[in-house]
A protein has these predicted regions:
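Extreme N-terminal leader/targeting segments of oxidoreductases
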Residues: 1-18, 36-37, 467, 475-479
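Redox-cofactor-proximal catalytic regions of oxidoreductases
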Residues: 61-132, 337-340, 344-348, 352
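Residue-level detector of alpha-helix initiation sites
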Residues: 24-25, 214, 367, 449
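Conserved redox-cofactor binding core of oxidoreductases
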Residues: 102-189, 406-411
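A glycine-rich dinucleotide-binding beta-alpha-beta segment and adjacent secondary-structure elements
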Residues: 170-183, 325-336, 341, 359-363, ...
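N-terminal Rossmann-like FAD-binding beta1-loop-alpha1 element of flavoenzymes
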Residues: 16-43
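Glycine-rich loop(s) and the adjacent beta-strand/alpha-helix scaffold that form part
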Residues: 36, 49-50, 193-265, 446, ...
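FAD cofactor-binding and catalytic pocket of flavoenzymes
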Residues: 235-241, 245-359, 364-371, 412-415, ...
């Protein structure tokens, strides 16, 4: 069932067992899992069926620290959430990402990758993925890895008809959950703002917050402020340990032999470090994206010459007025260390149209990120040399420790942390079942629960964790 606004929903008489706020990949996945087990779900989407500027304005905010995107540019506020601009790259977090590392403070999840594996077949079905090939070591330190370019499923489009026909899911559009009401043990209700006005409150036995890697923190921070920590009773880590995937063009590669690794359909290949290399070199996880540069005609001859006689190639290119790269560009996207000071906060004065404080994001890259960028490129270069596969040229700004360029991608638009998973309430917000510490009936879905970020795009892992949470809630609510 689909309703436009809370009034139409109330007129239906639908009674939910679970209220989910946010109809993106996590929220829709959890709702479908619960409905399949006969559990009734009210699924609240703050936006409508399509993009509109008025709704998107609610996502404006400010950023302090390193250059970053506008907060209303890096996510979307309508049915399907940020899947509506997802590029479609898929890979689940690596096993090493879940492990504690002595050189990475506050690393280590309370679960393992094996806890997600029972749900991966469903993930593949939902995201329309082919089977992943196993990682292929090209040295002790570097392995070829597969990222699959999926059809970039738009969750709102794909599941809209199924939801509209469901007797167990009530999707309520244009209805913004502004805050939750709790007493430090249970959430009793959610306050709503619907179609431009006060929507009252709605009660349910259980609540799931799944509004994204920024909004989850915002909603809970505002709820806590209004209820004297009645929603997150142990708030030390709330909004904290926020992470992105910094990514930059770090250099070029001249390739002699590519037979040891595979390219995808658009001439790209992906590499990441072994678990042993991460520990020995004291690195964060990282991914190198190798993009072949196809040159037609005369340019191809010069590019080929660059592999054999770079000085001659440079002279020829200069004489022809050509600025040629080597045979491949190297983009490095990396894990970010979970830092307490990187956090989502409420702006002290700026509010949205519903009166909710906007986000003030505090975000900086640290020394471990810079170390990983340089050492990762060195490690990849060493691997090419040892195996006579090619050579790497590292960009001068990377090699000499200059400032990060501001005219590149900056980051992956991947919002992780803020309500991270852990066993210690002083350093986490949810437990291994994604339940908020100290609360009986409040759960969180999405990448905000990531303890660490790994190096790969988060959507595949978001869906796997959402399926796991749906399975857990089914067990809890069926008792």
């Amino acid at each position: 069932m689909i309703f436009d606004g809370i009034s139409a929903f109330r007129a239906s008489g639908f009674t939910p067992q679970v209220c989910i706020t946010g109809a993106g990949p996590a929220g829709i996945t959890i709702a479908r899992e619960l409905a399949a087990s006969g559990i009734s779900v009210a699924l609240f989407e703050a936006g409508g069926l399509e993009f509109n500027d008025q709704s998107q304005d609610f996502y404006k905010g400010t950023v302090k620290g390193d250059p970053y995107f506008g907060l209303d540019v890096t996510r979307l506020r309508f049915l399907g959430g940020s899947s509506n601009h997802w590029a479609g790259w898929c890979r689940v977090l690596d096993a090493v990402d879940f492990e504690a590392k002595p050189h990475v403070p506050d690393s280590g999840w309370p679960i393992k990758r094996t806890d997600l594996e029972p749900f991966l077949d469903k993930v593949h079905d939902m995201l329309e993925l082919i089977s992943f090939k196993p990682d292929k070591p090209i040295s002790d330190d570097i392995r070829w890895v597969q990222l699959i370019k999926s059809p970039a499923v738009r969750f709102g489009e794909k599941f809209r008809e199924e939801i509209s026909k469901s007797g167990k899911i009530a999707l309520v559009l244009n209805t913004y959950v502004t805050d939750l009401v709790g007493d430090g043990k249970r959430v009793s209700s959610a306050r709503l703002w619907s179609n431009g006005g006060d929507g009252g409150e709605i009660a349910a036995p259980a609540f799931v917050v799944a509004t994204g890697g920024l909004e989850n923190s915002r909603l809970l921070l505002w709820s806590n402020q209004k209820t004297a920590n009645g929603v997150v009773p142990e708030p030390a880590a709330l909004g904290r340990y926020w992470m992105e995937h910094p990514q930059f063009e770090g250099g070029d590669a001249i390739l002699f032999d590519t037979s040891m690794f595979e390219h995808d359909a658009v001439g790209e290949a992906f590499f990441s470090p072994s678990a042993e290399a991460i520990g020995e070199r004291k690195l964060l996880n990282f991914g190198i994206r190798l993009i072949e540069q196809p040159y037609p005609g005369l340019k191809a001859m010069i590019a080929d010459l660059a592999c054999k006689a770079p000085e001659t190639a440079e002279w020829v290119a200069t004489g022809l007025g050509q600025h040629l790269r080597c045979a491949a560009q190297l983009y490095v996207g990396g894990e970010q260390s979970p830092g307490f000071d990187n956090h989502v906060a409420l702006h002290p004065s700026d509010k949205d149209a519903a009166g909710v404080p906007r986000i003030q994001l505090n975000w900086k890259k640290g020394e471990l990120e810079r170390h990983t960028l340089l050492e990762g490129l060195k490690l990849f270069g060493e691997t090419l040399v040892k195996n006579n596969l090619g050579r790497v040229r590292i960009e001068e700004w990377v090699a000499s420790g200059q400032d990060y360029p501001i005219d590149q991608e900056l980051a992956g638009h991947h919002h992780m942390g803020g309500t991270r998973m852990g066993d210690d309430p002083k350093k986490s917000v949810v437990d291994r079942d994604c339940k908020v510490h100290g609360m009986d009936n409040l759960y969180i879905g999405g990448s905000s629960v990531f303890t660490t970020s790994g190096q790969c795009n988060p959507t595949t892992s978001i869906v796997a964790l959402a399926l796991r949470l749906g399975d857990h809630l089914t067990t809890v609510l069926k008792v």
